[in-house]
């Protein structure tokens, strides 16, 4: 007790200069001392003694995983089974299985990390008021990914449209001669010895995986169950469905192929029909008749065009051109004479088309002026006829 008092008095000035006076309640101080005592016991009970390496088997593996905490979460630590004398400044850790009666399988092995210089993850202030913990993980060492293994990973090609997609296992790379890990799907297969596990977790192309190297050494029997539910990254089949397995993409792919197939069938039928039709007599007769009809049509078109040229070149339409008046009179008289039987129809306004009625009315008016007298002259003529008739009647009625 005296020694504790002397040490406290000796440390009191330095702590007073480093930290100001803090008022602490008795309950808080008791709780803090209790926590510090628990942490000290936990730190003293961490075993770091290196085990004998002569009886262990060596086989190297590297573990690549996007979730490095999953391995540590499945290991049971037993800090109370090793005495404080086994603690060494090295970073080696001994992990032993817990003796419990459970239905699940237990696994025990020694996890050894490479010797690297690192700071402690805890510290205690001089006045024992607070404890500072660091968040460094002492069991995981990150290393850059080597170029040799990165070259082995083929780039994932884009999914192609195929009618019947077949899932391709991406774990074919694990069957190379460099792999020495033996896995089995049976639940109770025992593996003994020291192994360094190496596998590359399947991830999508747009995510960047963190490469983590963990050295694992086993000192006892270990049961490994590689069921697809427990360890999906080692099962050889990715849980992410590919683009070829989607039902919509498959149906669209089959629809496109059906359309292309129908088009090719129609093209083949057309080619066969053309080749077979050239030899049939009906087809030849049809072609011959079509050619003759085309020739007749071209001849009629040429004749009509020639006739129009003659009409425009003749004096039928003398409008805008100077011509001989005697020839024009002869042409018009001949035309009226040739069409004298249809003049009544031509000059009937009711039968004339609407676009020609105005011109027909002008022609009728001019003909009436020429062929008929005016109304005044007509009335005088009628009066003369009436007077003549009266004279004739008077002469006949003479007694």
From Swiss-Prot:
A single BP term in Gene Ontology: fusion of sperm to egg plasma membrane involved in single fertilization
Biased composition range(s): Basic and acidic residues: 136-145
Region Disordered: start-end pairs: 136-250
Tagged with keyword Signal: yes
Keywords: Cytoplasmic vesicle, Developmental protein, Glycoprotein, Signal
Glycosylation sites: 128
Family, as annotated: Belongs to the SPESP1 family.
Protein name: Sperm equatorial segment protein 1
Species in which this protein is naturally found: Mus musculus
């Amino acid at each position: 007790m005296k020694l504790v008092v002397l040490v406290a008095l000796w440390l009191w000035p330095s702590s007073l200069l480093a930290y100001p006076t803090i008022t602490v309640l008795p309950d808080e101080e008791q709780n803090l001392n209790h926590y510090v005592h628990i942490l000290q016991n936990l730190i003293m009970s961490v075993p770091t003694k290196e085990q004998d390496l002569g009886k262990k088997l060596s086989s190297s593996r590297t573990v690549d995983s996007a979730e490095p905490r999953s391995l540590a979460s499945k290991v049971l630590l037993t800090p109370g089974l090793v005495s404080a004398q086994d603690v060494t400044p090295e970073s080696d850790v001994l992990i032993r299985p817990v003796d419990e009666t459970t239905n699940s399988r237990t696994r025990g092995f020694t996890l050894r990390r490479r010797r690297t210089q690192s700071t402690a993850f805890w510290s205690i202030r001089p006045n024992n008021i607070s404890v500072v913990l660091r968040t460094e993980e002492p069991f995981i060492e990150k290393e850059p990914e080597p170029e040799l293994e990165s070259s082995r990973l083929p780039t994932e090609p884009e999914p192609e449209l195929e009618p019947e997609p077949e899932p391709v296992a991406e774990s074919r790379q694990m069957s190379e001669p460099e792999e020495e890990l033996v896995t089995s799907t049976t639940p109770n297969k025992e593996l003994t010895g020291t192994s360094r596990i190496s596998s590359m977790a399947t991830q999508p192309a747009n995510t960047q995986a963190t490469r983590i190297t963990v050295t694992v050494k086993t000192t006892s029997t270990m049961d490994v169950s590689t069921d697809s539910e427990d360890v999906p990254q080692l099962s050889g089949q990715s849980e992410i469905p590919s683009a070829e397995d989607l039902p919509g993409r498959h149906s669209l792919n089959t629809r496109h192929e059906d359309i292309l197939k129908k088009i090719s069938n129609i093209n083949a039928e057309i080619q066969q029909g053309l080749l077979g039709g050239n030899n049939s007599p009906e087809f030849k007769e049809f072609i011959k008749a079509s050619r003759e009809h085309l020739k007749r049509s071209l001849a009629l078109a040429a004749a009509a065009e020639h006739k129009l040229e003659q009409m425009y070149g003749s004096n039928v339409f003398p409008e805008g051109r100077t011509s001989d008046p005697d020839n024009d009179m002869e042409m018009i008289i001949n035309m009226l004479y040739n069409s004298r039987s249809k003049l009544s129809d031509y000059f009937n306004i009711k039968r004339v088309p609407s676009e020609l009625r105005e011109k027909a009315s002008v022609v009728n008016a001019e003909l009436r002026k020429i062929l008929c007298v005016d109304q005044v002259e007509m009335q005088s003529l009628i009066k003369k006829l009436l007077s003549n008739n009266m004279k004739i009647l008077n002469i006949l009625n003479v007694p």
